């Protein structure tokens, strides 16, 4: 099957019907219409990229209308909205170190693709076996289970669903990788998320930062300034 993935931002969300029509013309089987996740360069440009709540509602309604006209034919459309507007965090990577292991070009083994922004040391497959990394490495074990969780996660009856949310997102927004993901309405830092979403659609405070090969800014440096 052919799978297409489209990255949705505030700049192109109004074209979502055209995107679906193009997907049908290309005979795609599955199409993910996913709002960009705010890590790396998307985080750096978040004020430009984050759609408003109304834009997301309008886009989802357009997707549902298109689905209704398909009569069971054509691509399967999957609409993914950003968790910034949710009251509970996503179960990032299905829980830290439970399902995924990412190997980067330099051989670093990571529990998730963004984990290198965290103040942790990660192993390398050039030096250790995958079996040893998965079962014994400190970084992979660090956020497994719930013993690391702060309040309110520790006593929450939903902790086995969302695992405290995204460690990278908690770190980016609060500077503390142990904190409850600010997406959660129970988080003492939830006001940070509301402050971000309330600004969506307003004039950004700075220009878009484009990543160029000849003038590349490492993501770690960008994150360190936050």
Task: Describe the predicted segments one by one.
Residues 1-110, 114-125:
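Radical SAM enzyme [4Fe-4S]-AdoMet core and its adjacent flexible, acidic
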Residues 35, 160, 169:
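Residues that line or immediately flank small-molecule/substrate-binding pockets and catalytic motifs
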Residues 52-86, 108, 114-164, 187, ...:
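C-terminal accessory region of radical SAM enzymes
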Residues 91-93, 167, 183-185:
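Sequence contexts marking disulfide-bonded cysteines in secreted/extracellular proteins
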Residues 97, 149-152, 180:
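A generic structural signal for well-ordered coil/turn residues at beta-strand boundaries
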Residues 160, 203-226:
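Short flanking/linker segments adjacent to small metal-binding domains or redox-active Cys/His motifs
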Residues 166-169, 173:
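A glycine-biased, small/acidic residue-tolerant capping/turn segment at secondary-structure junctions
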